[in-house]
Amino acid sequence: MASPTIAANAYANLARVLENSGAGKGSEASGQSFASLLKDAVGSVMESGRKSDAQTVAMAAGKANVMDVVTAVADTDVAVSTLVSVRDRVISAYEDIMKMPI
């Protein structure tokens, strides 16, 4: 299970991404699209996974500390959990919209 500090850092990173993307500013023409926001989020999760894999390989080669590997894996776990939560909410919203009468 991820520590509260790791979770707080993940949510702070997400808030920073949303702030930089212009989310919450209304329908501003210069804002980032929802698709590009999701693409950035998925890219961030993939990068976190790559870092975790690199730390694991480095530990197997004797070049990394176990604590670094555990931290990298926990960061990846939080990122994936956050992405899964977002996916679930998007699916739920889509299902709610599909149930609405025309």
Swiss-Prot record:
An example Gene Ontology molecular-function term: cytoskeletal motor activity
Source species of the chain: Bradyrhizobium diazoefficiens (strain JCM 10833 / BCRC 13528 / IAM 13628 / NBRC 14792 / USDA 110)
Main location: other
Signal peptide: none
Protein name: Flagellar hook-basal body complex protein FliE 1
Record InterPro entries: FliE
Family, similarity comment: Belongs to the FliE family.
Localization: Bacterial flagellum basal body
Transmembrane region(s): none
PANTHER family: FLAGELLAR HOOK-BASAL BODY COMPLEX PROTEIN FLIE, PTHR34653
GO BP, sorted A to Z: bacterial-type flagellum assembly; bacterial-type flagellum-dependent cell motility
UniProt keyword Ribonucleoprotein, yes or no: no
Keywords: Bacterial flagellum
Gene: fliE1
CC annotations in GO: bacterial-type flagellum basal body
